[in-house]
């Protein structure tokens, strides 16, 4: 292979690695939603909407992180619990415990509307966050499509270069033939 061809092929391979690395980072990103937090009014019932990207109906990886702290005395223990209920009123996730027990529950749930019901004793602060990884279900498809698109661009670029080179060569031949006939 010519040195120029090796360099060109190497650059396309580097581009393929860069595209897939960027997509891997995008697909791993989480969208965080504050459900209840310190300094905000506590809402015992929160609507939670899980939306898929690009019309996918695949289950979305989620994580609900909760922490309950007693307002008067952080070392004091009080009861706390929460339930995540889907549109058909079925409990899909739940947790029960006491204050000062931070917990993170992970699950994969289908897109849809959910309700988070939280029950706490008086003078308890609820800190609840929902993290969704919306691109995770289509991560593999994204890698395949982006890789195929990059390969198509690489072959298209190569074909375009060859086409232009042939056109220039044909034009030069026609010009040299017309000069000979003059």
Located regions from the model:
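Hydrophobic secretory-pathway targeting helix
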Residues: 1-35
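Membrane-proximal low-complexity regions enriched in glycine and acidic/polar residues
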Residues: 25-86
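Short tyrosine-centred short linear motifs in exposed loops/low-complexity segments
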Residues: 56-62, 110-114, 120, 124
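Extracytoplasmic/lumenal ectodomains and periplasmic regions of secretory and membrane proteins
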Residues: 71-119
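Short, aromatic-rich amphipathic segments at membrane interfaces
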Residues: 116-144
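Selective detector of the "anchor" transmembrane alpha-helix that sits immediately C-terminal
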Residues: 139-163
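Short, highly charged, low-complexity non-transmembrane loops/tails of multi-pass membrane proteins
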Residues: 168-178
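Conserved small/polar residues in nucleotide/adenosyl-binding loops
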Residues: 180-182
């Amino acid at each position: 292979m010519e040195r120029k061809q090796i360099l060109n092929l190497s650059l396309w391979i580097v581009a393929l690695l860069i595209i897939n690395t960027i997509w891997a980072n995008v697909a791993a990103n989480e969208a965080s939603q504050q459900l209840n937090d310190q300094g905000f009014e506590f809402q015992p019932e929160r609507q939670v909407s899980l939306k898929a990207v690009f019309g996918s109906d695949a289950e979305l990886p989620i994580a609900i992180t909760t922490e309950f702290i007693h307002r008067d005395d952080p070392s004091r223990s009080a009861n706390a619990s929460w339930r995540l209920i889907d549109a058909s009123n079925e409990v899909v996730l739940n947790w029960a415990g006491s204050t000062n027990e931070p917990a993170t529950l992970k699950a994969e749930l289908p897109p849809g509307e959910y309700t988070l019901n939280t029950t706490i004793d008086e003078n308890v602060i609820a800190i609840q966050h929902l993290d969704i990884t919306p691109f995770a279900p289509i991560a593999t498809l994204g890698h395949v499509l982006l890789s195929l698109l990059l390969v198509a661009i690489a072959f298209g670029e190569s074909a375009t270069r060859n086409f232009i080179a042939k056109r220039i060569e044909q034009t030069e031949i026609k010009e040299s033939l017309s000069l000979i006939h003059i």
